[in-house]
Amino acid sequence: MIERKQWTIKQAQELFDKPFFELLFQAQQVHRIYFDPQQVQVSTLLSIKTGACPEDCKYCPQSSRYKTGLEKERLMEVEQVIDSARKAKNAGSTRFCMGAAWKNPHERDMPYLEKMVKEVKALGMETCMTLGMLNGLQAQRLADAGLDYYNHNLDTSPEFYGNIITTRTYQDRLDTLDKVREAGIKVCSGGIVGLGEAIRDRAALLVQLANLPKPPESVPINMLVKVKGTPLAENEDVDPFDFIRTIAVARIMMPSSHVRLSAGREQMNEQTQAMCFMAGANSIFYGCKLLTTPNPAEDKDLQLFRKLGINLQQTQTAFGDNQQQQHLAEAIINADNEQFYNAAL
């Protein structure tokens, strides 16, 4: 294994500056040390509470400050969440992610959230939540319920952050990650490419993530999904090669983390997605709608996986059932195109 190092922004920028194929070659070499290059981890994402968020994240259609046409919805009933999780499992997903458009969860919501975690775990799936900021007690309660992962993105560099969000600080985000880690929950944290940031900001974001006391187990790299009504709706498109470079640098700097090809994948053709996998991406969202735009249809994903010879990573949880694991490949091949939800995080 490669010994972990503390990264500087200069070192990260030097990786971004490498010739494209040299960078991909290095990323693929690192990837093969830590992972099976033919395996991809698959998650399904469900918005359990949509819209009316009080924050001002300029990229997000869920903010109550922007007119995006998104209808707000109350916290879903536990039974609805479990039904969606069951469908996701039958379609081949091994991790179920539940997200709520909150600045932070309220005390009245915690019993429902804990029950959701317990019942999804009982299906034999890994669990993930993204609920905004957490205090230490909330993190511990979710950990005690069995939560495997908590997502809380840093979004961009500390220097550029204030151009995008003013309603919570960068330190607020780092503090939440600390509380999650202290509670024994695995960390999922990444960022967004295409906010108007410079290459240096992308490098600085990855340095922040890689230099955490322990790097995130999962690092989602999002391409900005431009939604009409948000302040970033007219941003320039991200050059696919710049996005692929970001995936590759993330893989090199965080070799043991799952690097997730996340929001924006619906904008990518097969060739770009294939290059992202070559650069070290080994996790995706599947069979769902991500944010307010659909991911590629499941059948298109399966066609691409077959073309590339990609297999789905099987995950055994403490409550996992062997039959589901044994028939995972068959289940996903036979999956239909049902959309699990029409929601945003």
Swiss-Prot record:
Q: Which UniProt keywords apply?
A: 2Fe-2S, 4Fe-4S, Biotin biosynthesis, Iron, Iron-sulfur, Metal-binding, S-adenosyl-L-methionine, Transferase
Reaction catalysis annotation: (4R,5S)-dethiobiotin + (sulfur carrier)-SH + 2 reduced [2Fe-2S]-[ferredoxin] + 2 S-adenosyl-L-methionine = (sulfur carrier)-H + biotin + 2 5'-deoxyadenosine + 2 L-methionine + 2 oxidized [2Fe-2S]-[ferredoxin]
EC numbers on record: 2.8.1.6
Binding residues for [4Fe-4S] cluster, per the UniProt record?
53, 57, 60
SUPFAM superfamilies xref list = Radical SAM enzymes
Cofactor: how bound: Binds 1 [4Fe-4S] cluster. The cluster is coordinated with 3 cysteines and an exchangeable S-adenosyl-L-methionine.
Q: Name one GO biological process term.
A: biotin biosynthetic process
GO MF entries: 2 iron, 2 sulfur cluster binding; 4 iron, 4 sulfur cluster binding; biotin synthase activity; iron ion binding
Which cofactors are required for activity?
[4Fe-4S] cluster; [2Fe-2S] cluster
Pfam families from the UniProt entry: BATS, Radical_SAM
Q: What pathway is this protein a component of?
A: Cofactor biosynthesis; biotin biosynthesis; biotin from 7,8-diaminononanoate: step 2/2
* Positions annotated to bind [2Fe-2S] cluster: 97, 128, 188, 260
Residue ranges of domain Radical SAM core in the record: 38-256
> 4Fe-4S as a keyword?
yes
Return the similarity comment. Belongs to the radical SAM superfamily. Biotin synthase family.
What is this protein's function per UniProt? Answer: Catalyzes the conversion of dethiobiotin (DTB) to biotin by the insertion of a sulfur atom into dethiobiotin via a radical-based mechanism.
HAMAP family cross-referenced by the UniProt entry:
BioB
This chain's protein is named: Biotin synthase
The record lists the organism as Photorhabdus laumondii subsp. laumondii (strain DSM 15139 / CIP 105565 / TT01)
> In the record, what lineage is assigned to the organism producing the protein?
Bacteria, Pseudomonadati, Pseudomonadota, Gammaproteobacteria, Enterobacterales
This protein's gene is called: bioB
